[in-house]
Structures are given as C-alpha cells and as structure tokens.
Amino acid sequence: MAEMDLIHEQGAALPVAARSDVLVVGGGPAGQAAAIAARRMGVSVTLVERYPYLGGLASGGMVLVLDDMTNGSEITVTGICMEMIERMQRIDAAVYPPPEDRRQSEEMWRKWARWGVHDFRSTSKPLPIVMAAAFDPDGWKRIANDMITEAGVNLRLHSWFSKAIVDDGRIKGVICETKEGRQALFGDVVIDTSGDLDVAASAGAKFAEGGYMVTTVFRLGGVETETAERFRWGEPAAYAKRDKEAKSIIGGSWDMWWLKTPLPGVVWCNCPHMTGLDALKVADQTKADFEGRKRIYALVDYARANLPGFEKCFVVDVAPQLGVRQTRLLEGRYVVTKDDVNDRIWFADTVARGRDYYTPYRSLLPKDIEGLIVAGRHYSATESAQKLSREIPPCMSMGQSAGVAAALAIDGGLSLASIDPRAICAHVREQGGDPGDSPSANATAPKMAAE
C-alpha cells in the first residue's frame, strides 16, 4: 500500500455531551447487557452506538439465531439474554423449541433443523435439538429499545467512537464523531463493547490481531419453505446435487445456507463467507460488501430457476453491517486458550459462561489501563479460543457481568481489578443470570493462572 498523504488537524475545544458513572461504548448485545446491568445496580449509565439502532451483529448483522447457550439439557446463559428471547417471543419475534422437543431424534431434526436450533458442535447424527432461538432483527431492535428505556439508560445513537481520553494511565471518557461535530463523553468507568476493541486499542491497551471470514448476511422473501423442505426429504439425491450447486455459487456457507425466521415466507442466509479480508481496513470492507452482493444476486437467479419453493424468491435485505467475527483481541490479565474452552476449564474468578466453557474476570481486564473493562467477542483470548466462544449469548453474559463490575467499582470507590469476582456473581444471580460460579458436572478442576 502506498504511503498516505498527511495533514495536521488543528485542535479545538469540544462540547461535553454526557457525564455518567458508567460509559458503555457499543450498543450490540454485549453493550446492551452491560448498560442494563449497570443501570439496574443504581448507577448512571450512558450508552453510545454508531448506528441508528441497538443490537449490533444480532440486528444489524442479522445473525438471527441465539445459540451456544446449553450444556446438554442445562441452559447455561440466562439473565438479560434470556429476557430478550422471552420478550421477543411474546411479540412473535422469536421462535424456540419447547422443552419436550429438545432431544435427539429424526422427527425433531426434521421439525426444527431449518430453524438452526440444534447443537452445532455435536458429532452425533441427527444433531440434537437444544434451547436456541431464531428471531427477527426488528423484533430485537424493538425489545432492546424497550429494555434500555425501562432501565433508564442515557442512550446516544448516531455517535461514532473516534478516540479514547486517557490521563496518566486511566481512561476518562471518549470522543465521538456526530452530525453535530465532535463530542466528548465522560464516565468514571468505561466499558468497551465495540466488538473490535476500538476503545481499549485507542487507550493503549495491549492486543493481538486475529482474522476470520466475514459474511454479507441476507434475507430472502417469497420462499415456500414447506415446498423446499418436501423437496429436501422427498428427493434427497436431486436436492443434494442442487444444494451443492447453490453453495458453489455463493462461494462459502454453512451446511444449511438458508434457515427459517419468524416471518412467513422469509428466510435468512448466513452466507456468503469471504476469507483473506481485514475487517479493520476500509478497502477490504468495501470489497466484501461488493463481492457479497454479487454472489447473492447470482444465487437468487439460480434458486429461482432450480430450487422448488424458491421460484418467486426475492432479496428482502442485505445486512447493513458486515458480518465480522474476529479482529483485535485484548491481551488482558489472563488470555483464554483453546484448551481452556475445549477442556471446559472452570476458573476461580469465573464471572460469565457460554455453552460449557467459562470466562474468567481477568480476561475482561486490560493489564495497563485503569477504569476500563471489556466485554464481547474481543475479550482476552487466543484466536483459536475466540472462534469457539464468540457467539452472542456468551457475549451477553460477559456484558452483564462487566456492567455489574463497573457498578460495584463506582459504589465502592474501588479499582476494577480489586473487585471480588464472587460479588459480581452474586449480583448477576440477583438479576437472573448464571455467571458460571457454580460449575457444571462436566467442568474441569478449578484453575487460577498467574497474571
């Protein structure tokens, strides 16, 4: 890449848009959970988000299944995540299998497979049906707005994070770009839920850079899903051939390239996947968006001509946010490893959990920046560990615990590092969450690695 031309920007006084006890940067699932949890603890909270909606990759990225939240028959992610699911279900914006259907059988597989509510990490066939929820992205936005409003969070949308404000090793707030110009926002504790570790990186925290495929998720309307499923089960050989051809056109997808949604005739497609792109670079993001749409339109043409049930399909929308899975990863007080996840290591300072793995409090804390805690897919983990632990429910579990930790620091006048993880867990449980402080039967012996 050619060296960029440089200009020198003249400094200017900035208006202060907000001062609060806790400042949360990033209104995705982890940020929502963090803001709500902290506010429920009684502290003042400001939440800033660059888009005109809440939900991040859940809503704007249209990752429309909440999974990785069960350990066998045990539901391991509850709290604010489960509140979202249940409230969306009450307005017909979420669908999940009832307890009696959460089992392994050919009957349940045929009934639920196209909802994506199966244990995708299982090696047995058919894949077991588990507690997971398919949802509508606008349903998410609606319930998120309700919950943020009910909690009393000061929400500032259309605010694009630009720079951390740091003084003598302590973060004080952030600068955001807005239509009104640059604005400063201050918080006694700052929570980075940006997804790309934007705040922590700007503040000077140590991090690694990972990389994983990106996706331009889209939805199709006008699909006769029952006809499509009859073709799948009634003509397996013909289905397999055409499904393979469709996947070849899209150029990268999971086993099932389309799944049902709560909206009749509307399916969502978690594809096409594209590799070798850096989601922190504008040129690569632009390339992904253009290439993704090109593949989508080619797939639609093929589906109309060749796939029963898709004869009249059309593109409802392409996700406004690129599906980014991994960029910067914090190098915090503890770095979670792939073995930690695969071996189900339980930590003495566990404060959050996913399917059958556990998140230590230290993995949310930068080593060298005071007043800052992180939550979400950019937490302190190796690339390989993060790929196994980055789903939305565990990120919400991290967010809820980070919000509680921030509030405890404010109330006690304490540093984040000095907060007792047991106190965090106790308050998360009071809010209906499962912070993982009581390990499941298949967890591995306690671990408290050195910082």
Residue ranges and their predicted role:
Residues 1-22:
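Extreme N-terminal leader/targeting segments of oxidoreductases
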Residues 2, 43-44, 49-163:
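Conserved N-terminal/central alpha/beta ligand/cofactor-binding core
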Residues 18-20, 180-189:
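Core beta-strand elements of the Rossmann-like FAD/NAD(P) dinucleotide-binding domain
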Residues 22-46:
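N-terminal Rossmann-like FAD-binding beta1-loop-alpha1 element of flavoenzymes
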Residues 25, 185-195:
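Short hydrophobic core segments
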Residues 103-134, 138, 142, 150, ...:
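Mobile, glycine/GP-rich and aromatic-enriched active-site lid/loop segments adjacent to catalytic centers
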Residues 192-205:
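Flavin (primarily FAD) binding-site architecture
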